[in-house]
Structures are given as structure tokens and as C-alpha cells.
Amino acid sequence: MKNLRNRNFLTLLDFTQKEMEFLLNLSEDLKRAKYAGIEQQKMKGKNIALLFEKDSTRTRCAFETAAYDQGAHVTYLGPTGSQMGKKESTKDTARVLGGMYDGIEYRGFSQRVVEDLAKYSGVPVWNGLTDEDHPTQVLADFLTAKEVLKKPYNEINFTYVGDGRNNVANALMQGAAIMGMTFHLVCPKELNPTDELLNRCNDIADKNGGEILITDDIDEGVKGSDVIYTDVWVSMGEPDEVWEKRIKLLEPYRVTKELMKKTGNPHTIFEHCLPSFHDTETIIGKQIQEKYGLTEMEVTNEVFESEQSVVFQEAENRAHTIKAVMVATLGE
């Protein structure tokens, strides 16, 4: 724990394989302790600011419950709860919050903002999501895969199907490279990740005994997969023309029962960071149905509700893994 004390958690690329393993192992320990009712508070009296430019269910609840479990106090600043970017610069906000709080979580748009918060606040800063990255999500994804598959991380064949430029896809590729996994990214060529990120991840994977495959061939990409992972195709606020183009590109990559069978592995599990457009039981789901005639988007309801789906175990693990990050970087 001491070697990560006062460290920021901005991107997985800042961490070694041993450091990632430590965080994942600590997550398991903290989860067991919580279930057994023997958790020890390592953050008693600490004050934490949660700075959200984007609303969230899982990230907010995970940070809040993890902090409370560990004896810390939380202030939530939502999209209209601070002056950052409006009447006050990120640099000034960082220095204000750094003088009052022991740690800061940021969930928003720009990776540059979370980096500036870390640069100027003087306290640990944790990335709860940016447009480019989502490192806390990956810890939960990997922990869940290990729990269910009962395999060491470097033996897991992890496949992401969908938008290859997505922040979760970026973060998963980084994490898989660091952990020495086999990672397949199955997506249309138009949605491949940047060459810069791919080259960096390939270099890391080579050093750690991992392998990365980028392909638009679904059969090739999913073969042998232990995990099939997807995320939403579009984000709220993107213009209609983006939705239409993205849906047309990605509709062949919807995760269906047939796609799951193509893995040839009867033990393949399905993961998703949530929320998911797998039915029409939401306002957005109904709008998608009315506008595009679709009742399911990135995954069918059949797969989402199947025994192969571990999405709610994965969601719970957000709290345990986020707790590990905070305890490791801030705990006594």
C-alpha cells in the first residue's frame, strides 16, 4: 500500500503489472472483509470531493459507499454544483479543493481536466471517467472475470465488440496489455482505436506476454473468448446524424446468442459497464425504438438476462475496486 500512497489514478498506463495486481488483490481482500463484517477503516476522518460534470449511477454510488465504509466524508459536486470551467478555472478549482479535501474524484469530459486537477490540487485525484478513458471500470471488469472464470488474469481471453474508439475499449486494451492478457477488439475499421494508443499497448503487451488483435471479422475476433464485452454505441448529446451513422456501422456487431456461440467456449461470460440499451423500458430505449425501429441496441435482451451475463456482479465490483484505489492511495 505504501508504494501507491499519494499517487493519482488517472490512467492505467501510469501503473505496472505488479501495481495493478496489487489493486486487484486488495479489492478481493476488501470485498471479503466487507462480506464477513470485519472491514477495518483506513480512511477515517478523510474528506473526499466528488466532482461530476457527467451524471452517473454506478460511479457515484461506488465512490460514496466505498468512502463511507472506510470512514471518510464525501461532498458531491454535480454538473451544476461547482464553478469550474464557468467562473473559475480548473487550476483555481484544483487549488481550492486541494486545500479542503484529502482526495478528489473527477468524472467528466476532458482527460486534460483530470490531469490539471492532479497537477494543481496537491492531493490524490481519481479518474471516474473521461471521454478518453475509464480506468476504474476496468478494475471491476477484470476482477469479475477472475471471480467467475477462476483463471489467472494472464490466461483470460478478453474480447470487446463494438466501438473501438470508445473510452471503455481504450481502457480495457490498456489494462489487458499491462496484465498480459489476450485481447481482441472486434469493430468496424472506421472505428479502430488510434495508432498511437494501439502502438503503445502493443509494446506493453509484448513485454508482458500478452497479445492484441484488432479485426472487423466477428468470427475471427470472438473465437475462443472467455469474455465478450460491449458498451453503448452512442452517447447522449451526440447529434442525430452521428447516431444514424454509428447504428448502421455497428448493427452487425450487436451481441446476440449467435455471436456468443461463435466463441466455441461454453463458459464464455458477458460483461457490460452499464447502462445498456437492451430493451425499451427506458425513455431513451423508447426514443430509439420510435426513431430507428430498434428494440435492442448493442446487446439483445436474451443475452443481457442470460446466465452468461455477469453485469450486476460487475457493477457491484465497482465499489470494491474503487475502494481499493482510495485505500491504496489515501489510506493510513
From Swiss-Prot:
The keyword Disulfide bond does not apply. Pathway: Amino-acid degradation; L-arginine degradation via ADI pathway; carbamoyl phosphate from L-arginine: step 2/2. Signal peptide: none annotated. Gene3D superfamilies: Aspartate/ornithine carbamoyltransferase. Carbamoyl phosphate binds at S56, T57, R58, T59, Q83, R107, H134, P135, T136, Q137, C273, L274, R318. SUPFAM superfamilies: Aspartate/ornithine carbamoyltransferase (SSF53671). Belongs to the aspartate/ornithine carbamoyltransferase superfamily. OTCase family. Reversibly catalyzes the transfer of the carbamoyl group from carbamoyl phosphate (CP) to the N(epsilon) atom of ornithine (ORN) to produce L-citrulline. This is Ornithine carbamoyltransferase 1, catabolic.
